[in-house]
Amino acid sequence: LYLRFPLSLRLVEEMLLERGVVVSYETVRRWALKFGPAYARRLRRKTPSRRDIWHLDEVVVTIAGQKHWLWRAVDQDGYVLDEVVQTRRNTAAAKRLLRRLLRKQGCPPRRMITDKLGSYAAAQRQVMPTVEHRSHKGLKGLSNRAENSHLPLRRREPVTQGFRSPRYLQRFVSVFSAVRNLFVPSHSGRSASATHLHRLNAMAEWKVAANVAA
């Protein structure tokens, strides 16, 4: 529940109590930290090949009063490819994200779409010089796919009352995005019935990954 829905630890505690399971919210937190990474690894092993357009964006996150940046890449379906918490919003930070992406994806994309931040262009020229790069400067909405990918995390922030450290945030998004990716339809523009079927299949896969009895 905590990994899938924007629920606080205390709300999960109350929902479990309603089902006859008596645990504290602190126990729920420990469960998420202990089992979440294993669930994410199982889900990633079944991840299909992603598509060939990368949308990149960065969003500011305040941790213990200090400004940090969460750099994220998604494909054209909105599937999160990778994300990394960094203290800088510069070329070095952009290069780190691109290198992580190349290592994890195994090959460069056909096209890379970003906002107008100059660090992306500088990093692209050094790390992926043959990849087509488009900036949405003057092309309103071109990078909305990446910008919209921040919304699920933004909805979680008030519930979690902030993140206690960069390491905690990195661990959280690693698991949170792996779970969320499972429920993202593979192609845009699906019918309602196809989307419903996708969700049923995703829930079945989630139960297998989490070792939940049917």
PLM feature spans:
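Short, basic alpha-helical nucleic acid-contact segments in DNA-binding proteins
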Residues: L7, V22, R30-D52
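Helix-centered, glycine/charged polyanion-binding patches within enzymatic domains
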Residues: K116-S174, V184-P185, G189
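C-terminal domain-tail junction helix/linker
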Residues: V159-Q161, Q170-A214
